[in-house]
């Protein structure tokens, strides 16, 4: 299983696209969200927020929810 660290940044859409491609390719993934990377300090939540292992339909729902979120 791959563990993907998704960093909140200006390139969020690229990170989520990587997740989508890996899931569509049949990879099992564990998504870990981390804080903003644009800081000189360690990102907020630098340990990441481990998400449970997601089925494809659950990941699609998570992605749709994240895309609606204006700020985290």
Question: Where are the predicted features?
Answer:
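Short, glycine-rich nucleotide/cofactor-binding loops
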Residues: 2-16
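Short, charged, surface-exposed secondary-structure boundary motifs
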Residues: 15, 40-42, 57-60
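A short, Lys/Arg-enriched amphipathic alpha-helix followed by its capping loop at the start of a domain
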Residues: 18-27
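N-terminal beta-loop-helix "entrance" segment that forms/cooperates
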Residues: 36-51
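Glycine-rich, highly charged phosphate/nucleotide-binding loops
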Residues: 47-63
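An anion/phosphate-binding loop that grips the pyrophosphate of nucleotide cofactors and donors
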Residues: 66
């Amino acid at each position: 299983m791959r563990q993907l660290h998704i960093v909140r940044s200006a390139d969020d859409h690229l990170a989520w696209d990587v997740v989508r491609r890996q899931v569509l390719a049949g990879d099992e993934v564990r998504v870990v969200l981390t804080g903003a990377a644009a800081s000189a300090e360690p990102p907020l939540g630098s340990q990441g927020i481990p998400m449970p292992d997601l089925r494809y339909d659950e990941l699609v729902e998570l992605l749709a929810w994240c895309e609606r979120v204006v700020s985290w």
